[in-house]
Amino acid sequence: MSDIEQRVKKIVSEQLGANEADVKNESSFVDDLGADSLDTVELVMALEEEFDCEIPDEEAEKITTVQQAIDYVNANLK
């Protein structure tokens, strides 16, 4: 597991109150981890803070799974 993958999963588990072992790459924030719209906004903000990046709203709307979050961070890290 890459450092980025590990950090994303840690943030997801902390933000959504999920057990880290339950946070899989294919996990959907809403369907599998029980996130609501406020949770997803807070999750995006936490990712932005952790990785010192800005995720535009239109991009954030496309990030619905753990893997998509990992891929976005990998592609957009400075």
UniProtKB/Swiss-Prot annotation:
Residues 2-77 form the Carrier domain. GO terms for molecular function: acyl binding; acyl carrier activity. The modification O-(pantetheine 4'-phosphoryl)serine is found at residue 37. InterPro entries: ACP (IPR003231), ACP-like_sf (IPR036736), PP-bd_ACP (IPR009081), Ppantetheine_attach_site (IPR006162). It comes from the Bacteria. One of its GO terms (cellular component) is cytosol. It is found in: Cytoplasm. Keywords: Cytoplasm, Fatty acid biosynthesis, Fatty acid metabolism, Lipid biosynthesis, Lipid metabolism, Phosphopantetheine, Phosphoprotein. Pathway: Lipid metabolism; fatty acid biosynthesis. Gene3D superfamilies: ACP-like. Its main location: cytoplasm. GO terms for biological process: lipid A biosynthetic process. 4'-phosphopantetheine is transferred from CoA to a specific serine of apo-ACP by AcpS. This modification is essential for activity because fatty acids are bound in thioester linkage to the sulfhydryl of the prosthetic group. Signal peptide: none annotated. Belongs to the acyl carrier protein (ACP) family. Carrier of the growing fatty acid chain in fatty acid biosynthesis. HAMAP family: Acyl_carrier. This is Acyl carrier protein. The gene is acpP.
